Amino acid sequence: KTIQLSEIIVGNSAAYIQKVYDRIKDNLIGNYTIDFFLRNVLKQEKETIVLQDLSGKKNQNISSKDKISIEILNMRKVKLYDKKEGIDFKFQNFEEISNLVAPSPSGCNFTEIEFNDENYKKIEFESKNKNTQGLGIKGYLVINKKDLAIVEFKMSSDIDTDLLPYSKFMLSKVKYRTPEWNKHIKFIKDVASNKYYPVSLKMDVKVEVVTDKKSFYFNNSIDLFTTSAPRDEKIIPNFSTDKDLFKAKFIYSADFWKSQNQLPLTKELDNFLKLVADKKDKTKEYEVTGNF
């Protein structure tokens, strides 16, 4: 039976959400390893300036001090740095990417919305109040009614930019702030363990930069997805999970990237690589960093 989207259902959704939170530990796999691919793209306004693709293994162990461990197997990356700009971008790390901050039952308003599958609930949330810097959140959760497991989660910024302050780079007049961000995670159930794990994650961040001459935006998009079922396997960690993603240093394998089909080069990215090739010898104006 298909339920059509219709009016808002008003109820005690905050109490229901607390029950969902109480089941998280039982619903999620505690210790497992998966294979993953990750794409990291940075644009300055609409122009791509960074491409980074990774493949590897991720171990998640909630009982360990290092809850996440990463073994990178393959990487290709390139960055086109315009020296006259004099501004670089700090990327997220694996801990920040994987971190899931649940909306507070007491700090948010929750509203159940009719969903197109009667086996699930969709509950939207938003901050009751923004803080003094204009920061708030909004988003939704999709929940399996049978076991109270979260199968989809999206959280976005809800910011009053009139109140949002700028930060400054040290010894510089350049200032910056983050007016927009969002994170979208999907979970599926592992057949063997009958528990859930995140199968895909997308994170987008928009950073506003203001100099004495102009203002512009950096737009960073990170996509991480799994390509295997969870398994019991020890990995050999070779990259710190609290380190800027782009600081990873691994040898490029042309054979691997030509044969894989998980992260194809779009026309836009292919044009970016051609642009890098055209400008890589203009060392006075540009600096190219990469492994291929």
Model-assigned labels for residue ranges:
Residues 120-169, 175-190:
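Feature captures eukaryotic membrane-trafficking machinery centered on endolysosomal pathways
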Residues 2-121, 166, 174-292:
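Surface-exposed, low-complexity/disordered segments
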